[in-house]
Amino acid sequence: MAVPKGSLWLRAQLGIPPLLLLAMALAGGSGTASAEAFDSVLGDTASCHRACQLTYPLHTYPKEEELYACQRGCRLFSICQFVDDGIDLNRTKLECESACTEAYSQSDEQYACHLGCQNQLPYAELRQEQLMSLMPKMHLLFPLTLVRSFWSDMVDSAQSFITSSWTFYLQADDGKIVIFQSKPEIQYAPQLEQEPTNLKDSSLSKMSYLQMRSSQAHRNYLEDGESDGFLRCLSLNSGWILTVTLVLSVMVLLWICCATVATAVEQYVPSEKLSIYGDLEFMNEQKLNRYPASSLVVVRSKAEDHEEAGPLPAKVNLAHSEI
């Protein structure tokens, strides 16, 4: 069963402050084993313990209670820092001093415990700075370097794809097309042969032999370079050619889009606004003259009062009208 995190649950269940409970656990059990077990989690307090030993040496303070109280203050500060996740060290120090006040009733032991809390504070700040320095930080130029690496990878892959194979199309006399495809073959200049190991040869013969081989290698290299100079230049500069082609393609596409938008017919037809003064505005636009009020003739008719419809015709029985 997992124990809930937080000091409120411990106070409610046990009625003992959690920091005091942890300090009692560290002091009551095997001191060395428990300290080694918690050092990896709570941090190293050896420097604080040495400071306490220098402050309370046994030859000056025969009683060991004050020394133990100071060392326990170091441990209490580490526990408080672990509980608070090291957010505010000043608050951690206040909690450590409060735990010392609850743990000890003697003023000397309380002072020694408070001194242990104070001694552990600079070491905790140093450890926190070291942890912050270990955190990875992103440089401002990291996006640019990422884009550059992506672009270089894309260019290299395209270059390797282009130079992966050579394809030749030949048309025979009967009209058939023959396709030759093969991987590019790299020709290296022939290496100079090793000098003869015969000790009887003179140095002059060695020099003439080397000059002859070097001139032959240079001549072969020039002949090969003249034969496939264009293809070699294309393969070496394919990266720049591909880059320029892509940039020009993007520029052409942008120009086409802008030209299309500029010359396109407007598809949006603005809706006409309705107004209660539409007739008046129409007359003003057409410059029509209004009729004066005196030229209007109003004709009124008198309605007859109490005018009723005539009586209905009498009903005739058709059976009595037979002849």
UniProtKB/Swiss-Prot annotation:
Membrane-topology descriptor: Single-pass type I membrane protein
Domain of life: Eukaryota
InterPro entries, alphabetized: Uncharacterised_TMEM59
One GO CC annotation: lysosomal membrane
GO BP annotation list: autophagy; positive regulation of autophagy
The keyword Ribosomal protein appears for this protein: no
UniProt-annotated location(s): Late endosome membrane; Lysosome membrane; Cell membrane; Golgi apparatus membrane
Processing after translation: N-glycosylated.
Topological region Extracellular: 36-238
Sequence intervals crossing the membrane: 239-259
Glycosylation site positions: N90
Range of residues in the leader sequence: 1-35
Recorded family membership: Belongs to the TMEM59 family.
Domains as described in the record: The ATG16L1-binding motif mediates interaction with ATG16L1 and promotes autophagy.
Task performed by this protein: Acts as a regulator of autophagy in response to S.aureus infection by promoting activation of LC3 (MAP1LC3A, MAP1LC3B or MAP1LC3C). Acts by interacting with ATG16L1, leading to promote a functional complex between LC3 and ATG16L1 and promoting LC3 lipidation and subsequent activation of autophagy. Modulates the O-glycosylation and complex N-glycosylation steps occurring during the Golgi maturation of several proteins such as APP, BACE1, SEAP or PRNP. Inhibits APP transport to the cell surface and further shedding.
Protein name from the UniProt record: Transmembrane protein 59
Biological source species: Bos taurus
